[in-house]
Amino acid sequence: MQAEKTPRNIKAARGTTLRCKGWQQETILRLLENNIENGERPEDLVIYMNAAKAARDWDCFDAIVRTLKTMEADETLVVQSGKPVGLFRTHAFAPRVLLANGNVAGRWAGDANMFELEKRGLTILPGMTAACWQYIGSQGIVQGTYQSFVSAAEQYFGGSLAGRIILTAGAGGMGGAQPLAGKMAGAATLVVDVDPVSLERRLNTGYLDVIATSVDDALARIRTLAAEREGGSVGIVGNAADVFEALHRKELRPDIVTDQCMVDPYRGYVPSGLSPAEAAQLVRTDPEQALALAAATLARHARAMLRFRDDGAVVFEYGNTLRARSVAAGVPEAGELPSFVTLFIRPLFCRGIGPFRWIAASGDPKDIAAIDGIIESTFAEGHMIRQWIPMARKYIQFQGLPARIGWLGHGERSKLALLVNEAVADGRISAPIAFTRDHLDAGSVASPYRETEKMQDGSDAVSDWPLLNAMLACSNGASLVALHSNGDKSASAGQTAIADGTPMAAFKLKSVLDADTGIGVIRYADAGYEVARETRALHGLGIEIGGGE
């Protein structure tokens, strides 16, 4: 199978005309197309992270599309690391698509071996939502990033980020949420990225306000925003290590410092002095030299962040393994930095609250507006989703198929989904709605450097939980179920359930979504978190062990 270099203009189909034999298959096909439409490098099927792919290659993509268009409503497509390998007669209640992406056994899952397996066309880096067709653009993590910044304000800055400066790096498909999230939280946010294309994309989609022409220009702009106590964002093109050092020399003292660069040297971390294209070429021709140069740059990058910390900034990693890689590069103090999960997100996970999302298969923004209305008439005024929806309407542009992210907890996701299914059935919503989520959720991931870092009981690396999550999703009839690994660093599960207005969809939605959040609550209760134990008791989840017969 040959890589295709001529770009295709892949766009998700809109409207209510079917190309497949049912709305379940059609919606999944549109989600795949939507991934490509929103991808950072669609000509290579790369969606984000400079490497996370939607399919192994274009031949595999075409075979997936062809199968989705012709398969029956009682068949299941099986995909192995972006390659369709089988179509099986199952039953109407079974998932239509099962995917296992990037899973490599234990000691063979390190960076170098994974990179070699990718080069040989045997696996892919799946990301969390790229290879299972659940990506909705940078919006996918904007609320979680916003929530982290707001929580930082509450914990460290008296409840407000007005007049505060956030410094960060990385403006790709994931990191691109940071400047908008910081602006929404009221901060003056400065984001550095070595790739001008990434910053231009964020500018064009409303996630970034302006791109500075130099470090001095960026400093002047960000200081003006902070002095005026206005939320806003500034981008600057440059290597994070170089720019962070320059900003420190010029006496910028940010209040919050974090980072969402792709720090994997094989897949996108750019050494100082090289362009992204030059770095990619060096990885191909001399990977050992690329690794050495990247490690030297990353060490400078981490030391700059530590200097900001020593000057009083709140500094934390945003889940990109910067700390572990910096420690390996000779900066042991980087391991002292906390994670955004342990600082801000874990209390939400204990209540089953996480990044739920819904996508309008019709492509009609009116369908999302209808769901906004359902939310506003269903959830109490003080609920975080009620606070979020007006902000999302104001600030977030749709990318590809109209979609929303909204953090909801146990029982709340199914409550919304059932009301939406009714609206599809009676025509208030014009076509099916796909409900899915990030893999960053309570019960769907084992990631000792991120979601499950420093678990109370030491169960950081126990990966039974995402496996159980995926098996539950299959048992309950999710339309699509995926199991992913990020090399030797994490394992995760994803699922999509489709509201097509039918009674069967209603049954599936209730079962799938309640089990998804329920296993998350149980996971944290099992680890000893009191809030999770209270939530488990409130909802009658779990099994009591001990205490007699």
UniProtKB/Swiss-Prot annotation:
The keyword Nucleotide-binding applies. Its cofactor is NAD(+). This is S-methyl thiourocanate hydratase. NAD(+) binds at residues 49, 173-175, 193, 198, 239-240, 260, 270, 318. It is an enzyme of class 4 (lyase). Binds 1 NAD(+) per subunit. One of its GO terms (molecular function) is urocanate hydratase activity. GO terms for biological process: L-histidine catabolic process to glutamate and formamide; L-histidine catabolic process to glutamate and formate. SUPFAM superfamilies: Urocanase. Keywords: Lyase, NAD, Nucleotide-binding. Belongs to the urocanase family. S-methyl thiourocanate hydratase subfamily. InterPro entries: Urocanase-like, Urocanase_C, Urocanase_central_sf, Urocanase_CS, Urocanase_N, Urocanase_Rossmann-like, Urocanase_sf. PANTHER family: UROCANATE HYDRATASE. It catalyses: S-methyl-(E)-thiourocanate + H2O = S-methyl-thiohydantoin-5-propanoate. Pfam families: Urocanase, Urocanase_C, Urocanase_N. Its EC number is 4.2.1.-. Hydratase involved in the catabolism of S-methyl ergothioneine. Catalyzes the 1,4-addition of H(2)O to S-methyl thiourocanate, leading to the formation of S-methyl-thiohydantoin-5-propanoate, the second step in S-methyl ergothioneine degradation. Cannot use urocanate or thiourocanate as substrate.
